[in-house]
């Protein structure tokens, strides 16, 4: 995943597969363990990331690393020393995660809230606008994939975190872990009530017996709101 400055060490976790994963042919007989490692240091921030495909037929995850928006071609807001990092955990295919990895950071920076340095609202608007951008994209028109998304905007004074789904952002403070995001899982009573009120249901810890998270980018099969 993604680490800024001081990475934390965690015990490895087993993949949580369901019977439908195997019957639908979504799992390889052996995991792809080749790893992609990337590091970069800027004037203010540094990052390291590691990606591995694992058991899935395709690499369904994506990421974005922006050390400073000023360094992007055509940057619309200059001089604020703002960075952006995102991790996008795909499911049901890779297209939604790849689209989000390519575009979400630009979508966020193009919001009026970002230009006004209201970064909390910029993340909210950016996530919603990314959904709309996927719907408008011709090549995504028949795609049913989705992704959990967690992203941070880093300024010289603060870190702003937004997420949808169950990918978690954790900050290391002198070796201690502090969660910056909140997992949207079906067994959370508040989230479960919201899903049921929208006409869905939760069965075996999954939305409509299928999806293991309650919010995300894409997954339009599960989104009834016409807006």
Where are each of the predicted segments found?
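PP2C/PPM-type serine/threonine phosphatase catalytic domain
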Residues: 1-227
């Amino acid at each position: 995943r993604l680490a800024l400055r001081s990475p934390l060490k965690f015990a490895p976790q087993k993949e949580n597969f369901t019977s439908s994963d195997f019957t639908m042919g979504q799992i390889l007989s052996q995991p792809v363990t080749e790893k992609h490692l990337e590091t970069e240091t800027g004037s203010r921030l540094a990052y390291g990331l590691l990606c591995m495909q694992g058991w899935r037929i395709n690499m369904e995850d994506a990421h974005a690393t922006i050390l400073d928006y000023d360094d992007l071609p055509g940057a619309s807001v200059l001089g604020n020393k703002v960075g952006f990092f995102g991790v996008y955990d795909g499911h049901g295919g890779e297209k939604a995660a790849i689209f989000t990895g390519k575009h979400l950071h630009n979508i966020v920076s193009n919001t009026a809230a970002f230009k006004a340095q209201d970064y909390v609202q910029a993340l909210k608007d950016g996530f919603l606008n990314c959904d709309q951008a996927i719907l408008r994209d011709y090549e995504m028109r028949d795609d049913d994939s989705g992704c959990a998304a967690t992203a941070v905007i880093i300024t010289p004074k603060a870190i702003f975190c937004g997420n949808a789904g169950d990918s978690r952002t954790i900050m290391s403070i002198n070796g201690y872990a502090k969660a910056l995001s909140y997992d949207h899982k079906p067994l959370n009573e508040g989230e479960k009530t919201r899903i049921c009120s929208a006409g869905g249901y939760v069965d075996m810890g999954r939305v409509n017996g299928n999806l293991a998270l309650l919010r995300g980018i894409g997954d339009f099969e599960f989104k009834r709101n016409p807006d």
